[in-house]
Amino acid sequence: MYTIFFYNVILYMIFFSQFIKCNNRKIEFYNSYINLKTKGTDNIRFFVLPRIDYPTTIIINNKINFTNDISDSYDFDISDNNINNITLIWNKSLTSTETMFWNCEKIIEIDLSNFDTSSVTTMKSMFFGCSSLYSLDLSNFNTSSVTTMESMFSGCSSLYSLDLSNFDTSSVTNMGLMFFGCSSLYIL
């Protein structure tokens, strides 16, 4: 059993061989469950990936159990990590992806083709500072409820092309600095 301290909430992550596969530089969360528990009456409001200090490929599936009621909303944060490739399969109802990949400077590719964004209202700074990000598939993003995309891709200086043809921006009120620092972006 490993203990991670975060924002005065102790999360107990119980890992058995069927729950997590960790070999060299690849971490894969299978369809089994990761149980996250809180101490006392505090609610878990974040699923936070512990800091990883070496280049890693990570695959995260959506089977995560929370012991307290977090039905109102919760965030998912893997920011500021040394991960270079992510496949994220998540169909829980997220309302915010703000700073989700904040400062993941080593990340080259993110596969979000199976990522449910239908309830997301803010994507502010979602990929901010992902300076090595070269490939990003957002073709299945449902952005009909999103109101802010401010700084969403700011600092993505290696991003060459981005297909936003399926983005519904009818509810968006703030796109300020959305592509600031995207000096390699030639195809939009």
Model-derived regions, located:
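Broad hydrophobic/π-residue packing in well-ordered secondary structure
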Residues: 38, 60, 88, 115, ...
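Consensus positions within tandem repeat domains that build extended binding/scaffold surfaces
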Residues: 98-100, 119-128, 145-154, 173-180
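Structural signature of tandem-repeat unit edges
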Residues: 84-93, 106-119, 131-147, 158-173, ...
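Classical eukaryotic N-terminal signal peptides for Sec-dependent ER targeting/secretion
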Residues: 1-9
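N-terminal capping/linker segments that flank leucine-rich repeat
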Residues: 10-118
